A protein has these predicted regions:
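Helix-rich cap/lid subdomain of alpha/beta-hydrolase
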Residues: 126-182, 197-199
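Conserved HGGG/HGGXW glycine-rich cap/lid loop of the alpha/beta-hydrolase fold
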Residues: 6-68, 82
Length: 274
C-alpha cells in the first residue's frame, strides 16, 4: 500500500508528512535540500514491519523559505512538537545529515520520546574542529562552502545546489550522480540552502553530551564518503555508550538515496534487535 500524504499544524506551521504501515513508529528526518520524498526508497520496506512517518522540515517542499528564522533549534522544537501532536513516542528515530543532527539533539534532551536512534552521517563539522586529522579536510570543506554561499548571495540557487552536491557526493558522481528524482527535489528546496547560511550555529554538543545518551544507536556511513564525515562518525562512536556501526557500499553522503537496498537492510536489521 502506498504512503498517504497528510498535513498537520504544529508550532504555527502546516507540516507535510507521508505515513505508511502499522506497528511501532519509525520517524524519518531528512537532511539539507531534502523533504519527505527523500525517503521514497525506504517507505515500502520499512512499512512492511513498522508505522513509518517521513515529514518535511519547516520551509522545505512543498513549502519554501522566503526569509525569517531557519535554525537547528527551531527544527528540533518542531520535531518534538510533531511527535507529541501525532502521539508517536517512543519512536525509532532515523536522521540523515542535518536531520541526524536534529535527531541526536532530540535524543539528548527528550530520551523519553526515543526507542532507538539511527544516525546516517550526522553533520556538524564543529564536533571535530579540534581533531588534528580533521583540520585539512575541514579547511577544504569550508573553502567549497564559501563558493556555495557566494552563489546563494548572487541568487544563483541552482548553481549553489549543484556545487554543494558536487562536494558532498564527490566520489558518487556529484549532483549528476544522483537519481533524477532527487536532483529535482533538491532544486525545489534550493531556498533552504540560502537559509542555512543565514541560520545560527547548532546547539553545543560535546562528547560528554553524547556519553549521556543511553539510547541504542546505529551510526551509518557511506563507503565513499568524505573523510571529515568519517571522522565525525568516529567521534560519535567513541563518545556514545551504546553504538553499532555499519558501512553502506557504493555510497557517499546521500547513502539512502543511491543505495536504498543496503541502507534499508542495515537499518531494519538494527531495528529488529531493539
Amino acid at each position: 500500500m502506498a504512503a498517504d500524504t497528510k498535513q498537520i499544524n504544529v508550532n504555527g506551521t502546516a507540516f507535510t508528512y507521508a505515513e505508511q504501515g502499522q506497528g511501532v513508529p519509525v520517524v524519518l528526518v531528512h537532511g539539507s535540500l531534502g523533504d519527505y520524498r527523500t525517503w521514497s526508497g525506504e517507505m515500502d520496506d520499512f512499512a512492511a514491519r513498522y508505522h513509518v512517518v517521513a515529514y518535511s522540515l519547516r520551509n522545505h517542499y512543498p513549502d519554501t523559505w522566503t526569509g525569517g528564522p531557519y535554525s537547528y533549534q527551531g527544527h528540533i522544537a518542531d520535531l518534538v512538537a510533531l511527535l507529541h501532536a501525532l502521539n508517536l513516542g517512543p519512536v525509532h528515530l532515523v536522521g540523515h545529515s542535518y536531520g541526524g543532527t536534529i535527531a541526536v539533539m532530540v535524543a539528548k534532551d527528550h530520551s523519553e520520546l526515543i526507542r532507538s536512534l539511527v544516525l546516517a552521517e550526522p553533520g556538524v563539522a564543529s564536533w571535530v574542529a579540534n581533531v588534528e586529522e580533521a583540520k585539512p579536510p575541514l579547511a577544504e570543506l569550508f573553502k567549497v562552502a564559501k563558493v556555495v554561499q557566494e552563489h546563494t548571495q548572487k541568487g544563483e540557487l541552482d548553481e549553489a545546489v549543484i556545487s554543494f552536491m558536487d562536494l558532498i557526493n564527490e566520489a558518487g558522481g556529484g549532483f549528476k550522480g544522483l537519481p533524477v528524482a532527487f536532483q529535482t527535489g533538491m532544486l525545489q528546496n534550493s531556498t533552504t540552502l540560502k537559509a542555512s547560511f543565514a541560520s545560527p550555529p547548532p546547539p553545543t554538543f560535546t562528547c560528554d553530551d553524547a556519553s549521556k545518551i543511553g539510547t541504542p544507536t546505529l551510526v551509518v556511513e557511506g563507503e565513499l564518503t568524505l573523510k571529515v564525515r568519517r571522522l565525525i562518525d568516529n567521534e560519535l562512536a567513541r563518545c556514545m555508550p551504546h553504538v553499532e556501526r555499519v558501512l553502506i557500499p557504493r555510497a557517499a553522503h546521500p547513502l539512502e538515496m543511491v543505495n536504498p537496498k543496503d541502507f534499508n537492510a542495515a537499518v531494519l536489521q538494527f531495528l529488529a534487535k531493539q
